Swiss-Prot record:
It is a single-pass membrane protein. This is NADH-cytochrome b5 reductase 2. Its EC number is 1.6.2.2. FAD binds at residues 140-170, 179-214. GO terms for cellular component: membrane; mitochondrion.
Length: 309
């Protein structure tokens, strides 16, 4: 090869290779690839550490319930809460430390914020609690920009997707991973929040064939929390979410059940007891202990397949 023509041939080769690369590379590859989930920063790094987060929005949902939105350390942060887990809020109220557990209604895919839906128990509205709820009233009195301490993740149940649940009998035990085809859910009042968290995770995954059946108990129709969200999921995923309501004091024309959760209601609206059916419950202790557990056992559900938040 002529020494003078060698640089020309090399230059032409570089141009050809560059043109071929630009022509053959996939469309849209100029954009920055999305961050893998494990690279997205998480706000909750250590379950023993308290993380102060600021209140950035407050929205009234109904007569006694509000949605509180807290900001995460940056717009790219997620909370870092596995499905099935909850967080603890802690605050000094009248000189005493008050700690309460909550399950966010926002997804852990949401970046930059976390949402809590809280029923506010005001003073002198419930004869058994004349002082009202300490934490709920504290939240209600927070101003935009005020911070409160978050701690987590916490809880004995984690949903790993596609019917796989890691469940611990207590905090000191190792989790046992079990697979279920159907999740029977019973919720009362604000106990709907962990159910919605689980329902959203299951219905968001088109490859997850797990079916959820939910009985949701409330006092009146106006007390039904997150009804629009539940009804929307049911409309969009009728084969994956079976939804039923019951009210203590229904209005005229109410088309669902009336009264406390009972065995007949469970038989009609939950899957029959089986080894591949998991029952999860969350609500007032009296409802769980007096209405739910005895009737579930009577219908043949095994204790090892029943989980109460």
């Amino acid at each position: 090869m002529d020494i003078l023509t060698a640089p020309v041939l090399i230059g032409v080769s570089i141009v050809v290779i560059t043109v071929l690369y630009l022509f053959l590379k996939p469309a849209g590859s100029n954009s920055t690839p999305p961050k893998p989930q494990n690279k997205i920063p998480k706000a909750l790094q250590d379950p023993s550490v308290k993380y102060p987060l600021p209140l950035i929005e407050k929205e009234e949902i109904n007569h006694d319930t509000k949605r509180f939105r807290f900001g995460l350390p940056s717009s790219s942060h997620v909370l870092g809460l596995p499905i099935g887990q909850h967080i603890y809020l802690s605050a000094k109220v009248n000189g005493s430390l008050v700690v309460r557990a909550y399950t966010p209604v926002s997804s852990d895919q949401d970046q930059g914020y976390v949402d809590l839906v809280v029923k506010v128990y005001y003073k002198n509205t419930h004869p058994s609690y004349p002082d009202g709820g300490k934490m709920s009233q504290y939240l209600d009195n927070m101003k935009i920009g005020d911070t409160i301490d978050f701690r987590g993740p916490n809880g004995l149940l984690v949903y790993n997707g596609k019917g796989k649940f890691a469940i611990r009998p207590d905090k000191k035990s190792e989790a046992e991973v079990r697979k279920f085809k159907h999740v029977a859910m019973i919720a009362g009042g604000t106990g709907i929040t962990p159910m919605l968290q689980l329902i959203r995770s299951i219905t968001a995954d088109s490859f997850d064939e797990t079916v959820c059946s939910l009985i949701f108990a409330n006092q009146t129709e106006k007390d039904i929390l997150l009804r629009n969200e539940l009804d929307e999921v049911h409309r969009n995923h009728p084969s994956k979410l079976k939804l039923w309501y019951t009210l203590d004091r229904p209005s005229e024309g109410w088309k669902y059940s009336e009264g406390f959760v009972n065995a007949a209601m469970m038989k009609d609206h939950l899957p029959p007891a089986d080894s591949d059916v998991l029952v999860v419950m969350c609500g007032p202790p009296a409802m769980i202990e007096k209405a739910c557990l005895p009737n579930l056992l009577k219908l043949g559900y095994k204790k090892e397949n029943i989980f109460a938040y």
